[in-house]
């Protein structure tokens, strides 16, 4: 038995938690460089604000309607997510963190001692008490059905109280008959159009379709979905995220970069951040790649994009080695005379240990005290805030940094941003 817990309008809700003056007002969160809408609360949805709406096209409408805009505050969202997930882990013996704002909880055995709907209400109330965030809870025998139950809990929140238990077969079929097939987890626009052309219009139609027909006309993924809709668990709980195959750190610049020193600062910063992520995964890497590109949509400007990579002989997780390799790659592809829009650093070829056969000609032999130094650096930055300790190559005045003109305070992670009671 699974419960899917999903925070309602997560990014927008994180902003209103610390701004009670915004309760009941339309709130949206913008993407990198304040480009377009990536999150909106119920009040903003009621005004017709759509995901992906460009901010510069909608700012007059937002001003007239009193829509409050925020730049993406990822540091705040990550910390609030950790608080939600920690609460769920206290309430359930096993939890799979599916994304920043949703998780699957294992309820095996719970139904033997608790009413599942009451337990879902307890989850909802506890998360609300500890974080002031509202979650929808969908409960069912499979992950796909739990997703469907969660969808119903959020769509009909007033009637359901934000909790839907679909463990009853009759309730399952009643809900499935009321929902279009594209509401099913994992079914995109292309597949839903094909299903519609075959006369499969509702979720119940799909659940009742012969498995042999699905296998013949589609793939094993959709077959698994149909089995899950019938209450047959095909997707197990994954408590530990699979090991990453690569790490990418890239951004679009707030202002176009035209000079080499600024680009080198950006690449150093991205390499340092990628190395930090690598260490958090307890991995070492040998492959470091750098890419730079101009905008393909710029008028009267030639497009240029290129990448280069370095393969180290010895796996490393030391920021100094990774920055050195990334800047060497930059030197191989840099061309003056362009207005660069984006750059990034990618790490690959991971190892669980930084061990390799060395010879006299290795140019990146392990540095003495490397692990201890990186641990001190990560610990200090985690405690005092990212960027407290950084490399000189990252620069001080980073004019190219991502634009976040409407950034809210980092209320939970920066002592300087703590709320003050007057």
What function would you assign to each model-found segment?
Residues 103-109, 307-313, 357-362:
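Short, hydrophobic beta-strand segments
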Residues 183, 191-339, 355:
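DNA-contacting surface of Y-family translesion DNA polymerases
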Residues 98-102, 140-143, 283-287, 338-342:
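Short Gly/Ser/Thr- and Asp/Glu-enriched loop/turn motifs at secondary-structure junctions
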